[in-house]
Swiss-Prot record:
It comes from the Eukaryota. The keyword Glycoprotein does not apply. This is Temporin-1CSa. GO terms for cellular component: extracellular region; membrane; other organism cell membrane. It is found in: Secreted; Target cell membrane. Belongs to the frog skin active peptide (FSAP) family. Temporin subfamily. Expressed by the skin glands. The keyword Ligase does not apply. It comes from Rana cascadae. GO terms for biological process: defense response to bacterium; innate immune response.
């Protein structure tokens, strides 16, 4: 996954 997507996923978690 892209760093941006990973950041969004981390925000949801």
């Amino acid at each position: 996954f892209l760093p941006i997507v990973g950041k969004l996923l981390s925000g949801l978690l």
